[in-house]
């Protein structure tokens, strides 16, 4: 049985009006679909509009043309139905792990006992039990990002939007976080749209990958990822993984080469 269509981007265009009346087209007629409980990745050359796209989906920016639909309803502003995790940890430095995770729940008016219980569930989900009373300055980068993920998931968004959330982490911590997120996706069924410049990350985590062209950004190709077994660092050496990785690398190399030659 086909899964329900959760998120849809239709003919989305973004034009920035520059000085001297010169327009810059950042996105050009982008079309994208994410089904319920699906893990979808977006990759593309630097400057192709990936972050602009996810900001429009999140309601942080507006499109010049086109539309974003969540459960068939037009998205025009930020909302609790979309949770966002960025490369920066965006934690409140004066709040403990527990209080950071509880913050959104408190803003919703959820009673103290209930929000403490729910926050604890998500702290355990990301493996930070025992650090409830720690401040962000006492945590490593990977631990801070775990808190950010727990805080976002605690608000139970319908879609989790992630913009290079592991980009600032060292290679070893990044792999640990990738495996953690893959496990969370399996256990919770959260719908995830994830931007990355890391092709390994895209193939490891994604069920489908949207490959964007250079600016003006549009969707060049959609790739289904079929890896056997559960996703882990062991998946990185599978023939299916390497074949998909090469296909994407060849596309991005072609984009870079054409840009360098001014085509």
Predicted regions and their residues:
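Hydrophobic anchor residue at the start of the ABC signature
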Residues: 149
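Catalytic Walker B motif of ABC-type/P-loop ATPase nucleotide-binding domains
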Residues: 160-163
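Conserved ABC transporter NBD signature motif
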Residues: 66-78
């Amino acid at each position: 049985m086909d899964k329900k269509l959760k998120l849809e981007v239709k003919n989305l265009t973004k034009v920035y009006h520059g000085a001297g009346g010169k327009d810059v087209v950042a996105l050009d007629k982008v079309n994208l679909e994410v089904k319920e409980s699906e893990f979808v990745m977006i990759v593309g050359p630097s400057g192709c509009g990936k972050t602009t796209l996810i900001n429009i989906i999140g309601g942080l920016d507006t499109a010049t043309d086109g539309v974003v639909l969540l459960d068939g309803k037009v998205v025009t502003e930020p909302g609790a139905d979309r949770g966002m995790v960025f490369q920066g940890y965006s934690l409140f430095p004066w709040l403990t792990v527990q209080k950071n995770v509880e913050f959104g729940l408190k803003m919703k008016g959820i009673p103290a006992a209930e929000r403490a219980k729910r926050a604890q569930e998500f702290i355990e989900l990301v493996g930070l039990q025992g650090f409830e009373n720690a401040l962000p300055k006492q945590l490593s980068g990977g631990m801070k990002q775990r808190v950010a993920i727990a805080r976002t998931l605690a608000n139970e968004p319908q879609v989790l939007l992630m913009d290079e959330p592991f980009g600032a982490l060292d290679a070893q911590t990044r792999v640990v976080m990738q495996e953690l997120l893959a496990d969370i996706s399996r256990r919770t069924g959260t719908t995830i749209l994830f931007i990355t410049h890391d092709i390994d990350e895209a193939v490891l985590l994604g069920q489908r990958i949207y490959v964007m062209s250079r600016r003006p950004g549009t969707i060049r190709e959609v790739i289904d990822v079929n890896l056997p077994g559960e996703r882990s660092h062991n998946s990185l050496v599978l023939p299916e993984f390497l074949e998909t990785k090469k296909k994407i690398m060849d596309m991005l190399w072609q984009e870079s080469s054409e840009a360098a030659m001014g085509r």
